[in-house]
Design a protein with these regions (language model features):
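Metallocofactor- and cofactor-centric catalytic cores in central/energy metabolism, strongly enriched
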Residues: 20, 76-80, 104, 136, ...
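Glycine-rich ThDP/TPP pyrophosphate-binding loop and its adjacent helix/strand module
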Residues: 2-8, 13-143, 149
Length: 194
C-alpha cells in the first residue's frame, strides 16, 4: 500500500506479536521476548518498520506512544492527515500477551516507561520538508534513562519469564535487547543530525 504512492493513512498498533491469532512471535517481536514460536526468547532484533517505510523517500512516517507524549501523538496524526501521499503511524500498543505485571489498566503508563527508558523512541519523518531549511526527521524522544531499561523489561512477563525458564541465558538476551534499542536510537540521532 505504501509503495502505491496513494494518499492513504495507515495506523499500526504495534503489539510486537501476532496478537489476533494468539501471540505468536513476529518480525516485530523484540529480542529476548518469549512468544509462541520463540519459547526460549527471540534471539534476533525486530524489524524497524518505520525505517523500512522511510526508505521509500515519499512516505510520511511517525512512531508514537500516546501515553508517553500525547502532544507528539496528535501532531503526528495531524501531519499524516495533511500529507498528500501515503502515511504510516506506528503506535506502541501494550497488549495482554506482554503480561504487564502492573496490569493492562496501566498500559498508558507502560507506554511512558517504554519511552523514558529507551525501549521505544518517538519520531516523525515528513518528506515535504526535504529541500527546505528544516530536517525532515524529528527525533521527539528525550535522551533515555538507560538505568531503567532492564527494570522495564522485567515488568513484563514476556521478558521476565526468561529468568524462570532459561536463567542461564536471560541476562544475555535482555542485555541484547537493550543494545538493539541503543543501536536504533543512534540511527535515529544520525537522521536528526544530532
Amino acid at each position: 500500500m505504501l509503495a502505491s504512492g496513494e494518499n492513504v493513512n495507515i495506523l499500526v498498533l504495534d503489539t510486537e506479536v501476532y496478537s489476533n491469532t494468539g501471540g505468536q512471535s513476529s518480525k516485530s517481536t523484540p529480542a529476548g521476548a518469549i512468544a509462541k514460536f520463540a519459547a526460549s526468547g527471540k534471539k534476533i532484533r525486530k524489524k524497524d518498520l518505520g525505517m523500512m517505510a522511510m526508505s521509500y523517500g515519499y512516505v510520511y512516517v511517525a512512531q508514537v506512544a500516546m501515553g508517553a507524549n500525547p502532544v507528539q501523538y496528535l501532531n503526528a496524526i495531524k501531519e499524516a492527515e495533511a500529507y498528500d501521499g501515503p502515511s504510516l503511524i506506528i503506535a506502541y500498543a501494550p497488549c495482554i500477551n506482554h503480561g504487564l505485571k502492573a496490569g493492562m489498566g496501566l498500559s498508558q503508563k507502560e507506554e511512558k516507561l517504554a519511552v523514558e527508558c529507551g525501549y521505544w523512541h518517538l519520531y516523525r519523518f515528513n518528506p515535504e520538508l526535504e529541500g527546505t531549511d528544516k530536517n525532515p526527521f524529528s527525533l521527539d524522544s528525550k535522551e533515555p534513562d538507560w538505568s531503567k531499561f532492564q527494570d522495564f523489561l522485567k515488568g513484563e512477563v514476556r521478558f521476565a519469564s526468561l529468568y524462570k525458564l532459561f536463567p542461564e541465558r536471560a541476562d544475555e538476551l535482555l542485555q541484547r535487547t537493550e543494545e538493539f534499542a541503543k543501536i536504533r536510537l543512534e540511527s535515529y540521532k544520525k537522521l536528526a543530525g544530532k
